[in-house]
């Protein structure tokens, strides 16, 4: 088994407290509302939303995938960080055992820097290259931009 790590950084005009509320704490409600073609719905299968919680995300009609399950590893509201592991679903191939994600929002001027790290745990000696994860990164960035646009258009939301 190998582990391949990829890092991304994005910037936003939205400050960390507001962005974290929308992008992490209320994403299960907000994303299906603003991007139903991407995420149809999200549900908690076990847990209370904190570490150890198992969620099932059902993708929308526009997605190539049906669903994924992920386990929340940590939620740190004070430091605007969130980590979860993709543990089941058709986004996991026969070569990938799991994918762990870490996201941290850092204040930058009046906005944020979003730091994201993905750890792909492969089966056997399979190698994951950056181009293999590029499409997923682009979709995630597009979803992030939708959330950012929503917050810009709804200045009273998530304050």
From Swiss-Prot:
Q: Which GO terms describe its biological process?
A: abscisic acid-activated signaling pathway; defense response
Q: Which UniProt keywords apply?
A: Allergen, Pathogenesis-related protein, Plant defense
User: One MF term in GO for this entry?
Assistant: protein phosphatase inhibitor activity
* Top-rank taxon: Eukaryota
Is Lipid biosynthesis there in the keyword field? no
State whether keyword Heme applies: no
Q: Which Pfam families match?
A: Bet_v_1 (PF00407)
- A GO cellular component entry from the record: cytoplasm
SUPFAM superfamilies per UniProt: Bet v1-like (SSF55961)
Similarity comment: family membership: Belongs to the BetVI family.
Q: Which PANTHER family does this chain map to?
A: OS08G0374000 PROTEIN-RELATED, STRESS-INDUCED PROTEIN SAM22
What's the name of the protein? Major allergen Mal d 1
